[in-house]
């Protein structure tokens, strides 16, 4: 008990210092000002399906600088996507990123870095279309890549993620 009280006091002091430092880091100064930027919006497009269309509409409402991004892990999928894009792509540009090792993260991070260089302090919103299956065990089978990408993008400065969910009707 004699040791516990001083240890608790030290822990509480550390926590207090953390909150004071956090408050100082977030405090506005006269030099701070709101600067409107043209946000770039990237809609991840693994394929063209009903879950992607609401994501494209959402992205168009955020900015005039919208691009659909497909990471090429299978050339057959790319050809089908390109064929269907003119009909269903809503006039948005489609950017295809090569991924020789079937990695989603590395090509996307490299492209985000390129986009951020286009304008100083440009924010990038990455829209991740997801479909929500009606049964819990179906959810275990889908959207795992989206979860991994959201986790990686969480630690990228100037990058915001947005999920657009499409709720599937009951399926077998």
Regions found by a protein language model. Give the residues of each.
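Cytosolic C-terminal regulatory domains/tails of membrane transporters and channels
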Residues: 3-7, 15-172
């Amino acid at each position: 008990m004699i040791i516990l009280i001083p240890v608790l006091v030290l822990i509480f002091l550390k926590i207090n210092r953390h909150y004071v430092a956090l408050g100082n880091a977030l405090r506005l100064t006269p030099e701070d000002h709101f600067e409107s930027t043209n946000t770039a919006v990237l809609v991840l497009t693994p394929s063209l399906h009903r879950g992607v269309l609401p994501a494209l509409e959402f992205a168009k409402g955020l900015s005039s600088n919208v691009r659909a991004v497909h990471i090429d892990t299978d050339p057959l999928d790319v050809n089908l996507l390109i064929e269907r894009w003119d009909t269903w792509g809503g006039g948005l540009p489609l950017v295809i990123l090569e991924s020789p090792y079937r990695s989603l993260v590395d090509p996307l991070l490299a492209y985000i870095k390129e986009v951020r260089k286009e304008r100083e302090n440009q924010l990038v919103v990455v829209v991740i279309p997801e479909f929500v299956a009606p049964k819990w065990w179906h959810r275990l089978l889908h959207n795992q890549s989206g979860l991994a990408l959201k986790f990686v993008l969480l630690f990228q400065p100037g990058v915001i993620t947005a999920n657009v969910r499409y709720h599937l009707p009951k399926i077998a």
